Amino acid sequence: MSRLFTIKLISNTKDSLVYDIWDEDRNEYVNQIEVSKKDFSYHLKSNQKLSNSYESSAFRAIKRAISMNVAPKEYSDGWG
């Protein structure tokens, strides 16, 4: 079974990007993540550490976006 996550841009400032993370297969909100553009540190709204594949995949996608100096309004990817 394949799994699909979507991140939706909430905020783009000079210091960070904030995205909502969604489980697209179930159409469920997973969490919100803020990632620093300077050092890739992150803060999750409801957890202290990345705790599932949706959060870790979203974090990797956001780090790639920051490295490319972009902030997509929405991005989806999956695995499985």
How should these model regions be labeled?
Residues 28-80:
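Acidic, low-complexity intrinsically disordered segments
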Residues 3-33:
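N-terminal acidic leader/helix
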